[in-house]
Each structure stands twice: as structure tokens, then as C-alpha cells.
């Protein structure tokens, strides 16, 4: 029998005894006034019975833990610790699970002392409902009173920073009442005690995987065009091997189809369905196969991991050897880009072929070769190259009259064969002969147009014999015309 029931039974027994001994004490007002002597004899017993009834009807809750705590509060902008007497109550028919605190003052420390001291002496009462508790964690970084440990009790409304001499002795019961069903204290308190248990420190496994290397996944074949062609339907077992995916019967070990990983075009999972697209080289032929399974994401990750491992074993499939480009050194020796050589006039050997450089490219790429030019063009380019490499001469409009003349003599003193009016020389026939220096005298001599063409006429008379008279007459008229222009103004080449 509990204490409350026992007190109630004792109170009822005393009341019955009092009613039997003093029958006149019925409790009515009129009778009490008529028999005052009987009232005086019954009053002490009634007072004792009333006190027992008050105790039995309002029994005191017994806390599961009580003691001194320190609670942090802010006073005038400064954090202070207040010493309180804490009472931890469990939930029951008479109240909810809560943590009550009374400020400790002079006149009493315990709950009984505080009650007898009165409201002015026991201080303010604070209640924290454990049903509103969110977390209970140790607060090692907080400064707290000496020989105490701080812990943070967070509720839905605010956070309470408490400190106790034995922190875990308070955190454990609070967590058991605030988080029923967990069976243990919060993770923070467990972590706080883990170094004290002497556990061996462990390291994380970097290659840990939650799925098996060779997994078997029960699936249901979805209806697709490829599945209908292969006559696949109903439940089956999808087995992931090191090199291929096998489809087996649901209640047997016979393999129905096999799809090598390197023959799969695509694969993926979406909303509980794993699907892949097989290539033409698969035994089932090309097409889309779909399988419904609750572990479709795990199946997709397993296939991706198997493909990655197979790629590591066969690096030559993913790393093709680069084909080196042919270098310019592997070709026949050519002239330096941008430089042309002058070929002496005369027939070329039939075995030698002259290559023409179209456009120089980078040194690491093969040179681009153009078509073989004709003899006239090669002589023209050679003449231009020679004139560009020498000192610049006077350029003017009338130097092109040399085209009408025959080619001068060669370096060896032998005259070149004369050209016919409608024929070309079989050898190189440059516009300006390379063997004759057409540069005029230096600045000390006369460099006017009239003097230059007179010099040209003298050379024609000395070197050329048998010239047609029309050309000589034409040149004479031209010299006369130029002399007239000279009198009118400076020649175009003399203008700045």
C-alpha cells in the first residue's frame, strides 16, 4: 500500500471513531449551538482529521533528483551565475516532467526550508518543461564556477546555460525524461563520456561501401520493345558480375541473358526503375530494357562502380595512343622558307624537279607544296629577289621599256639568241637580265631622265647590231619628248 492510501485510510478511521464517540456532533450549526460542551470535546479531533485530509488530498511530488545548480543570467549587460536549488520531476498523473529551480537565499536551502520561509525568502520559482526540450549538450567552452561543468539545455523558446559539480549526473536523467524512447542519453553526453571509457581510437575506412561487390537484386521486367522481342516478363533476378550484368530466373540459377558492361550504351534509374540501353553486339540485340525495383539507385551506383573498375583494368580503351604528326625533317630537304635562289639559264636536268613554296607554315607541320611554276615565272621571281636583296634603285614608269629590247649579253660574253616576234626563248627569259647591272651612276653623275636614256641609246648602239630602224626612231622621239618635259618641270622620280 502506498503512503497516500495509507494516510487516507487512517484519516477515515479517525473520523469514524470521532463520530461514534460524540454522536451529538453531527456538524449542524443549530445542534452545535445547543450543545456547546460537545463541540469543545470534538474540535481537537476534527482539527487533526482535517490536517490529515489536507495532506492526503494534496500529496507532495517526490523529485527524482535535487541539488545545487548554477544558472547563468545577464544583469546590467554582464553575465553572472546565480545559485539555485533544482528539483527534477518525472511526468505522471499529477504533473508533467519538468525542472524547477528556486533561488537560494538566507533562511533555507532545501525545498522544505524554502516552503517554510515564505514567498519573500524563497525567491522566484522558475519551471522548464522538459516536453519543450530540444537538446541537452555539454558546453565546454563556457566559463563557469570553479569545480563545475556547464551544459546547455535548449528549449523551443530559449536556451538555459546551467552548471553543476557533476554535470553528467544531471544530463543523464534530463535526457531520459526529455527524450523518452531513445534508451540512452543524448549524443552530446555520450560523446562527452567516450574518452573516459578507454575505447581504442579508430580511423575511417576510405574504401567502405554499403553495397556488395557482386550484388543480386530482385527485379520485375518492364514491358519494352526489346523485352517483348526477347520474351522477358515477370519477376527475375539481376546479378551484377565483374564483367557483365546477368538476368536469371527468380527461383533458379539459369542465366537468361547477359549484357557486358562495354556493350551498354546508356544506363540510369528514375522513380524505382533501373534501365539501360544495350548495343548491337549484345546477345539480346540492341534495345532498351527496364526493371522495376525498390533499390534502383543502389543498382545504378553498383553498375557505375563496376564500369569504373573495368575502366581501370583496361586503360588502353580509354587512353588512345596519340598519332604524332609528320615533322618537316622527315620530308626531303627544302630551301629555307621565304628565300628563293636564282637558277642559271639553261635546260634543267630531267631528274630534278623544282618545288615551289606556296605559304610557309609552323615549323612542326609539313610544308605546303604548290604546283611547279613555268620557266618565265621562276625567272621573274628570281630577278625580283635579287633586286630586293641589293641596293634599291630608282624606280619609275619608263623602265619597262626594256621589255621591247633584246636580252643583253651574258656574263661569258656570248650573245643570247634573238627572239622572234611571236616566239619565246626556250631558256629562262627574265624581264630584267640578271647579268647586266642596270643601276645608273652615283650621285656625282647626272641622273636626269634625258641623260639616262641617252646612255641607254649608247648601249644599244654598241651592243645591238641589226636593230630595226623603227625602234631607234621611236627612242629618239621619246628622248626628245622627255627633254621637253624636263624643261617644263622636274621628272616624277625627282619630286620629293
From Swiss-Prot:
GO BP term (any one): cell surface receptor protein tyrosine kinase signaling pathway
Record carries keyword Cytoplasm: yes
Domain IRS-type PTB intervals: 213-317
Membrane protein topology class: Peripheral membrane protein
In-chain residues carrying the UniProt-annotated modification Phosphoserine: 194, 330, 364, 425
Keyword terms of this UniProt record: Cell membrane, Cytoplasm, Membrane, Phosphoprotein
Family the entry assigns: Belongs to the DOK family. Type A subfamily.
Domain-related comment: PTB domain mediates receptor interaction.
Protein name: Docking protein 3
Source organism per UniProt: Homo sapiens
Lineage: Eukaryota, Metazoa, Chordata, Craniata, Vertebrata
Encoding gene per record: DOK3
Amino acid at each position: 500500500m502506498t503512503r497516500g492510501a495509507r494516510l487516507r485510510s487512517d484519516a477515515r478511521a479517525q473520523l469514524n471513531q470521532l463520530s461514534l464517540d460524540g454522536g451529538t456532533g453531527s456538524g449542524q450549526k443549530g445542534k452545535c449551538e445547543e450543545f456547546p460542551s460537545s463541540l469543545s470535546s470534538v474540535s481537537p479531533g476534527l482539527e487533526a482529521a482535517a490536517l490529515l485530509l489536507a495532506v492526503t488530498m494534496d500529496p507532495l511530488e517526490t523529485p527524482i533528483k535535487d541539488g545545487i545548480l548554477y544558472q547563468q543570467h545577464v544583469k546590467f549587460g554582464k553575465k553572472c551565475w546565480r545559485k539555485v536549488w533544482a528539483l527534477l520531476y518525472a511526468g505522471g498523473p499529477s504533473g508533467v516532467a519538468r525542472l524547477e529551480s528556486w533561488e537560494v537565499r538566507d533562511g533555507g536551502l532545501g525545498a522544505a526550508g524554502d516552503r517554510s520561509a515564505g514567498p519573500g525568502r524563497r525567491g522566484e520559482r522558475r519551471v522548464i518543461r522538459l516536453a519543450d526540450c530540444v537538446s541537452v549538450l555539454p558546453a565546454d567552452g563556457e566559463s563557469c564556477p570553479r569545480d563545475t561543468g556547464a551544459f546547455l539545455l535548449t528549449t523551443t523558446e530559449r536556451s538555459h546555460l546551467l552548471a553543476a559539480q557533476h554535470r553528467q549526473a544531471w544530463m543523464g536523467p534530463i535526457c531520459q525524461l526529455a527524450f523518452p524512447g531513445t534508451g540512452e542519453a543524448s549524443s552530446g553526453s555520450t560523446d562527452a563520456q567516450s574518452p573516459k571509457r578507454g575505447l581504442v581510437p579508430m580511423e575511417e575506412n576510405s574504401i567502405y561501401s554499403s553495397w556488395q561487390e557482386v550484388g543480386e537484386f530482385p527485379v520485375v521486367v518492364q514491358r519494352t520493345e526489346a523485352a517483348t522481342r526477347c520474351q522477358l516478363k515477370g519477376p527475375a533476378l539481376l546479378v551484377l558480375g565483374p564483367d557483365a550484368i546477368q538476368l536469371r530466373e527468380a527461383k533458379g540459377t539459369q542465366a537468361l541473358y547477359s549484357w557486358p558492361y562495354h556493350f551498354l550504351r546508356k544506363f540510369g534509374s528514375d522513380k524505382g526503375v533501373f534501365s539501360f540501353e544495350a548495343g548491337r553486339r549484345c546477345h539480346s540485340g540492341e534495345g532498351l530494357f527496364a526493371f522495376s525495383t525498390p533499390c534502383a539507385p543502389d543498382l545504378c551506383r553498383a553498375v557505375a562502380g563496376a564500369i569504373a573498375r573495368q575502366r581501370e583494368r583496361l586503360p588502353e580503351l580509354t587512353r588512345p595512343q596519340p598519332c604524332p604528326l609528320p615533322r618537316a625533317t622527315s620530308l626531303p630537304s627544302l630551301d629555307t622558307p621565304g628565300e628563293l635562289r636564282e637558277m642559271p639559264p639553261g635546260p634543267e636536268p630531267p631528274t630534278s624537279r623544282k618545288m615551289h613554296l606556296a605559304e610557309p607554315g609552323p615549323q612542326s607541320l609539313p610544308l605546303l607544296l604548290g604546283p611547279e611554276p613555268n620557266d618565265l615565272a621562276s625567272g621573274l621571281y628570281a630577278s625580283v629577289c635579287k633586286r630586293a636583296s641589293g641596293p634599291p634603285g630608282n624606280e619609275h614608269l619608263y623602265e619597262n621599256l626594256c621589255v621591247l629590247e633584246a636580252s643583253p649579253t651574258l656574263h661569258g660574253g656570248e650573245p643570247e639568241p634573238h627572239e622572234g616576234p611571236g616566239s619565246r626563248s626556250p631558256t629562262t627569259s627574265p624581264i630584267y637580265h640578271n647579268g647586266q647591272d642596270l643601276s645608273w651612276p652615283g650621285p656625282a653623275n647626272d641622273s636626269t631622265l634625258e641623260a639616262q636614256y641617252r646612255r641607254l641609246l649608247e648601249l644599244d648602239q654598241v651592243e645591238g647590231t641589226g636593230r630595226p630602224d623603227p625602234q631607234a626612231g621611236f627612242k629618239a622621239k621619246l628622248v626628245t619628248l622627255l627633254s621637253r618635259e624636263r624643261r617644263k618641270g622636274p621628272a616624277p622620280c625627282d619630286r620629293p
